[in-house]
A protein has these predicted regions:
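Conserved HGGG/HGGXW glycine-rich cap/lid loop of the alpha/beta-hydrolase fold
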Residues: 38-88
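Active-site loop/oxyanion-hole signature of alpha/beta-hydrolase fold enzymes
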Residues: 67, 77-119, 289
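Flexible "cap/lid" loop of the alpha/beta hydrolase fold
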Residues: 133, 140-174
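Catalytic histidine-centered segment of alpha/beta-hydrolase-like enzymes
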Residues: 275-284
Length: 297
């Protein structure tokens, strides 16, 4: 294994072999390149037009999908949302779904206009839902992972332990070492594989000139981008699957029932066992099978 102190000098794709092993993929890895479109950065997987678009959650980045994309084996586009990964930060700190959807729509229109499926987790799920309502031609089918418009309210009601890794977004921003950053991450998600979390921190952090480490994502200052999201649901006509983590507190049964009752395109809700909020991190292979089933129709 590569030592922690050597990570800062690595290419962002240097650990993909670990993701492939986790996904059970032994064949040659597909091509993957970083693409920049104005303020938005993304990962383009494969040489053909993307069949699946992936939007990550708050405090994450496009690499959160690496294992899932490798397991799925299809051309894909994974986008860094504004203020995350290698995408630009907003001066107002509003990273809500409304402005996010406006920012990623032209990127999807250019790079993945014919995608069959959009997959969004948490903040990415709300962004995808907003995109489906405002730019329906870009969202032929939707999978929302562990989120409904009530998720911001649920977030306010949770303890630090119930939030899991999401709690890190509200915590310290600078660390003396990569190891210190990894330690707080492991403490927030003790059920997760340490190597998987190590990759996650590698992709979600950067070393500063003074040798300390910090997160790649900006501080959330919210704005009004999370308001009125339930008002969009009656206009959600794209076929939609809701995936829930069985151990998550971000979506309760009442939220799921209300979403299914209100969204015209609602197809099914699937609960993933032994998973918290981040299904792609906790149970990536189970998510791969769900996405394959959705794509088959």
């Amino acid at each position: 294994m590569i030592a922690d102190d050597a990570l800062a000098g690595l290419d962002e794709f240097a650990l993909l072999s670990e993701n492939a092993a986790q996904a059970g993929v032994s064949s040659a890895l597909p091509s993957v390149v970083r693409v920049e479109r104005g303020p938005i950065s993304a990962l383009r997987w494969g040489s053909d037009s993307a069949r699946v678009i992936f939007l990550h959650g708050g405090g994450q980045n496009a690499h959160t999908w690496d294992t899932v994309i490798l397991g799925l084996g299809l051309p894909a586009l994974a986008i860094d949302l504004p203020g995350h990964g290698r995408s630009a930060w907003r001066e107002d700190g509003d990273y809500g779904p409304k402005l996010n959807a406006e920012a990623v729509a032209p990127v999807i229109e250019e790079l993945a206009p014919d995608a069959q499926l959009v997959v969004g987790m948490s903040l990415g799920g709300l962004t995808a839902m907003r995109l489906a309502v405002t730019t329906p031609a870009l969202v032929r089918e939707l999978v929302m992972i562990d989120v409904t418009p009530s998720a911001p309210e649920r977030h306010e009601q949770m303890t630090q332990t119930q939030m899991g890794l999401v709690s890190l977004v509200q915590g310290d921003r600078e660390f003396q070492s990569f190891a210190a950053m990894l330690d707080v991450t492991v403490a927030a998600a003790p059920h997760r594989d340490r190597n998987s979390l190590r990759r996650g921190v590698f992709h979600n952090s950067k070393q500063l000139d003074d040798g300390t480490w910090t997160w790649r994502y900006d501080t959330f200052r919210k704005g009004d981008g999370f308001e009125g999201l339930w008002d969009d649901v009656p206009a959600l006509v794209a076929p939609t699957t809701l995936v829930r983590g069985a151990n998550s507190f971000f979506v309760n049964d009442d939220d799921a029932l209300e979403f299914g009752r209100t969204a015209p395109g609602f197809q099914q809700a699937i609960v993933v066992r032994d998973s918290g909020h981040s299904v792609q991190g906790d149970q990536p292979l189970a998510l791969v099978e769900i996405l394959r089933s959705v794509l088959k129709g």
